[in-house]
């Protein structure tokens, strides 16, 4: 669930991006997981899907090692693009999925995350994401 006002619009990073709809302060909570709405499935369930369904999960989601489940967000957080100079990140003190601002973020600035926090370089390259 996104906890700030936001906008979806064309991104200079890739396709559509998620942009702050208000000024955001360093450390401010941006996103938390929504266990009742997000998709969380086991490897066995993933294996039972047809290839098109798997492709959707591989594109929009990721395999969460700690829970040993495939995860896909239900909300617009899926439009947070990758950047090595990310504006948001997970804080090590939280065990559940969440994102906080790494620095002050201006209104209309794109929210980005370093995908290497939860995926390998190999995974990103397979998806065509520039590292």
Predicted regions span which residues?
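Conserved catalytic SET/PR domain of SAM-dependent protein methyltransferases, capturing the structural core
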Residues: 1-131
